[in-house]
Regions:
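Charged, low-complexity interaction regions
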Residues: 23-35, 52-55, 73-76, 95-99
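Short, charged early-sequence alpha-helical segments and their helix-coil boundaries
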Residues: 49-85, 103
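Amphipathic alpha-helical binding modules
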Residues: 73-120
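Short, flexible helical or helix-coil boundary motifs
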Residues: 20, 24, 48, 65-72, ...
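Generic structural concept
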Residues: 14, 38, 42-45, 62-66, ...
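Short terminal alpha-helical segments
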Residues: 1-44, 107-120
């Protein structure tokens, strides 16, 4: 995996996260779970700027979103689902170890000890 490929994933991921965040912000049903997903999207968007392995953050992000969607019965329309599929493709580049290193349901995995985690 070359630097140019990593940079391409970073750019695509940031654009996709931005678009998904905007669509979720427009939804009328702003539940606590949906607000948590938006918080995590914003946090990963920020982390991608400096991360050496953006695909790992995207993998964690998509696993968190899928887990929250199942747990809280969140339905994503086609446009939002298509954006998550793009993120899923980038996240697959993290390899198998990326899936076993995090609790998918825990929002705190996206925040360092010095960062304040929003609670809803």
């Amino acid at each position: 995996m070359g630097t140019s490929q990593t940079e391409a994933w970073r750019v695509t991921a940031r654009q996709t996260i931005h678009a998904l965040y905007q669509l979720l912000a427009q939804r009328p049903d702003q539940t606590a779970a949906l607000l948590d997903i938006r918080d995590v999207l914003l946090q990963v968007y920020r982390k991608l700027e400096t991360s050496k392995r953006p695909e790992i953050w995207v993998n964690r992000l998509i696993n968190y979103i899928r887990n929250a969607a199942i747990k809280d019965h969140i339905y994503f329309p086609k446009e939002q689902e298509a954006l998550m599929l793009v993120l899923g493709e980038i996240g697959q580049k993290a390899g198998f170890n990326g899936q076993y290193r995090a609790d998918f349901s825990d929002k705190s995995q996206f925040y360092s000890l010095t960062e304040t985690m929003p609670r809803h």
